[in-house]
Regions:
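Short beta-strand-plus-loop segments that form exposed binding edges in beta-rich domains
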Residues: 287-296
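C-terminal effector modules
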Residues: 277-279, 291, 300-319
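Flexible loop/turn segments at secondary-structure boundaries
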Residues: 1-2, 38-42, 130-132, 198-200, ...
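Substrate-binding groove of N-acetylhexosamine-processing glycoside hydrolases
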Residues: 1-122
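Short, compositionally stereotyped local motifs that mark structural "simplifiers"
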Residues: 68, 74-190, 195-235, 241, ...
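Short, solvent-exposed loop/turn segments at the edges of secondary structure
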Residues: 26, 249, 295-297
Length: 319
């Protein structure tokens, strides 16, 4: 299943592996992409899986790395959507942007949605039902004053439906900081011998070891059947609404102050899920659970209210 990073992941891929020397790099003549179809039931689904990623691959193959520009590619891509519509290609519509899976606001919030494809109509519901062309159309920012669940869906001019997107806007107050005095910098990671596929079951599995880590990641000693429970405190530098981007392969969850903020659970390929939490300045208990059975990936990024990523340093986490 593709996500918001799938297209940029192709465009930003570097085929010149660091392990290759200059003579070996000169032997690379081109690129090839493959699509495994054992779980793809139709030609339409094939088109959905390869377009517009095929365009990103083509530009990656013929462009010198020094002139590559993701923003420039997006500008060129916008001009191709009308052609794809005329050709009736079942391309994957660009992801709706401007929100997280969970969004926090103080007092009054604003729902402001954008889409790279200008030809689509965006419709939405707030009762949990699936949007149709008869549902309210999104025509501009929406003010929210209470916790509200939105379901969005894009529609192409020919009526083709895009992916269903759900997001929650949570009316919040700044969660108070904990009265705690942790003794160590970083986080504690407990590795369980876990063979399941739900984060909630990890605690029941036998423990293989305990590790100290500086950030949310898989300790280098951990391999095979992985069930991780990472605990500690996040040090919020000031009162604010923080965005937490949790990337994992397979499942993961993030709790802050005991509340589920990011739910990226279940078996899946690399996927990033985002959530927000309003936090007062100071220490806040966090818990990340994660599982995988064949290597995997785990990463947490924290952004401030103005979208700036907080650097991982000795003051960010403690336990």
């Amino acid at each position: 299943q593709q996500d918001k990073n799938s297209l940029s992941g192709v465009y930003n891929y570097n085929p010149m592996l660091e392990s290759l020397n200059d003579a070996q790099k000169a032997l690379i003549l081109g690129m090839q992409a493959n699509l495994w179809c054992e779980y793809i039931p139709s030609r339409e689904r094939i088109q959905y899986m390869i377009m517009p990623r095929m365009m990103a691959l083509a530009e990656l193959a013929w462009s010198d790395p020094s002139v590559k520009s993701w923003d420039g590619f997006k500008e060129r891509l916008v001009k191709q959507f009308p052609r794809l519509n005329i050709m009736n290609v079942n391309y994957r519509m660009p992801d709706l942007e401007g929100f997280n899976n969970t969004n926090a606001f103080i007092g009054e919030g604003t729902v402001a949605i954008t889409c790279l494809d200008p030809s689509v109509e965006i419709h939405y519901t707030t009762d949990g039902s699936i949007p149709t062309l008869e549902s309210p159309q999104y025509n501009g920012p929406i003010k929210v004053t209470e916790t509200t669940d939105f379901t969005f869906r894009s529609f192409r001019p020919n009526g083709k439906k895009g992916d269903i997107v759900k997001t929650r806007y949570v009316k919040s107050e700044y969660a108070p900081a904990a009265d705690a005095t942790p003794s160590k910098k970083g986080l504690q990671a407990v590795w369980h011998e876990f063979k399941g596929n739900k984060c909630a079951d990890i605690d029941n599995a036998p423990v293989n070891g305990t590790y100290e880590i500086s950030e949310v990641t898989i300790p280098k000693e951990v391999k095979g059947n992985i069930g991780l429970v990472v605990t500690g405190y996040f040090n919020a530098p000031e009162d604010g609404i923080y965005t937490f981007n949790l990337l994992s392969d397979d499942g993961s969850t993030l709790k802050i102050n005991g509340e589920l903020v990011v739910d990226n659970d279940g078996p899946h390929s690399p996927r990033e899920v985002t959530g927000q939490k309003a936090l007062a300045k100071g220490l806040h208990p966090i818990e990340v659970k994660y599982f995988d059975h064949n290597g995997g990936m785990l990463q947490l990024k924290v952004l401030t209210a103005d979208g700036k990523e907080l650097p991982v340093n000795a003051d960010m986490f403690a336990y």
